[in-house]
């Protein structure tokens, strides 16, 4: 909902999603898949409407600055799943039913908690439905 809301407000939104496992966005039996499987270090797939860039990582390290450069032109860049990267201000999304430890207790860069648990917390708490307020927080100086 947040991305759609920001888009409605005319922001160009980029999202960088961290995968904790190997993944593939290309499909077997396509030319691009065969080229990549043959050993291409970088493969770019382009159509009239879409562009996808696949790059084989040499190092397991994640370079946030490199990811930001890859997403130049975005007004807002959302990183999802990068909880260990201290350089980024964070919004924690935590539902009571998931019964997970609250990240803000271990990470001091969590600026906002989005939850269905509206009990008192030492950081600001908003519900999933408060998309306008979440947007205001993202656009504030504290992020």
Language-model features: locations:
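Charged helix-capping and loop-helix junction motifs
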Residues: 29, 60-63, 97
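N-terminal phosphate/diphosphate-binding loop that engages ATP/GTP or pyrophosphate donors
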Residues: 1-58
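Short coil/turn connectors at secondary-structure junctions
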Residues: 9-12, 40-41, 72-74, 87-88, ...
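P-loop NTP-binding site
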Residues: 6, 70-71, 141
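Phosphate-binding/switch loop-helix module in NTP-utilizing enzymes
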Residues: 55-85
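Phosphate/Mg2+-binding loops and adjacent switch elements
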Residues: 76-143
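Solvent-exposed alpha-helices and their adjacent loops that cap or buttress functional pockets
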Residues: 36-37, 69-71, 103-106
């Amino acid at each position: 909902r947040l991305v759609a809301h920001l888009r409605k407000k005319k922001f160009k939104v980029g999202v960088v999603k961290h995968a904790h496992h190997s993944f593939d966005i290309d499909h077997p039996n396509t030319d691009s898949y065969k080229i990549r499987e043959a050993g291409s270090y970088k493969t770019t797939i382009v159509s009239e409407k879409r562009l996808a860039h696949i790059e084989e990582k040499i190092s397991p390290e994640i370079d946030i600055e490199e990811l930001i450069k890859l997403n130049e032109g975005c007004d807002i860049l959302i990183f999802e799943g990068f909880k260990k990267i201290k350089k980024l201000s964070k919004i924690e999304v935590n539902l009571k039913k998931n019964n997970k430890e609250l990240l803000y207790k271990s990470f001091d860069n969590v600026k906002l908690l989005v939850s269905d648990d509206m009990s008192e917390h030492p950081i600001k708490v908003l519900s999933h439905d408060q998309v306008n307020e979440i947007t205001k927080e993202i656009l504030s100086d504290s992020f």
